Amino acid sequence: MISNEQTKEILDAMVNKKVLAVPENIKDVVQVFKDQTLVHQLYSVYKDQRLKKYYLSATIVYENQNHMIDEIKRIFNENKIDFILLKGSVIRKIYPKHFLRLQGDIDVLVREKDIDLATKVLVNEGYQQGYAWLHHIEFQKNNMIMELHHHLFKDPKQWNGYFVSPWEHALKVEEHEYKFDDIYFVMYEIAHLAKHFKGDGAGIRPFIDFYYMFNDDKVDFENIKNEANKIGLENFLNSIYNVIGYFFGFDKVKYQPITYLNDYVEIIIQSGTHGHSKNSNYYANRLAGKKQSKFKFYLTALFPSHEKMKLMYPYLNKYPILYPWARICRICRCIFVKSKDVNKIEKAQKDIERHKNVYDEIGLRS
């Protein structure tokens, strides 16, 4: 691990184009920033030739993702399917250099009535259909992942129903491509980040996104505050201001300092991109985000839902009759192997009070 202060120094150098001396713990720095999907940006900070490979690799990934985005646009326009690009495909355009904002996958929203047609035309174009979640379907092509959304969240009615009708907030770009209005886009990004924190956790990258988003002089902070109140995320919005203020300095809007900021920042650094770095304990994040007994949580974690079981044991997708056998395998693994999940849950008990303090203050305990 590296300290909060060192992380802050590196991030400040990234956004303000400063060059730092290569530290003695450069291997630790590289590992942390790999976990955060930010390692490619270290080359501009240290100008160390050993880091150039990450920088060059990022440009290749960016071009490949660009090609996929252009292909998706063509496919949906040719088949008269309305669509909205989500998340990183939009956010990267506000970065000084677009390729600096990498994406784990490409997210696209279509109208619910078009989901079957969209699936069909993608498969016809060589996209391999994967797992179907409640709100999106996964596709893969050329080792890249696309998520085809028909809803923005698994439960569209959460966040007080704010995201039930996203197309009412859509503005036409050209042909069949649409985009969200600015406020709705920001609200979606805030709620999406909150979802990750209530799940396995989230890392630094979204806060860099918000730093660039909120540094636009046209941002209507009063409107953002009012909309955040509507979805119950006013405290979480305030916490975002605190974090980008800590890392980069931020004076575009007044915000209330939070008591557990250092713990909050440490959790973010430990989490990695989506809570699965070696130093992260996503069970502590999950347990902190829910007001339920440890016993109930322990049972839920060790005996996952049917949906999660299918991810852990892919053969269930093809042979659902083997579900009882998969349950037996899971129970035996927990009892006799002392699995990674068990170890993480035990460690979570030590971390939980710190996490609860943070989650209470940022408004994500439910």
Predicted regions, residues:
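Conserved NTP-donor binding/palm subdomain of two-metal-ion nucleotidyltransferases/polymerases, i.e.
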Residues: 1-104, 110-366
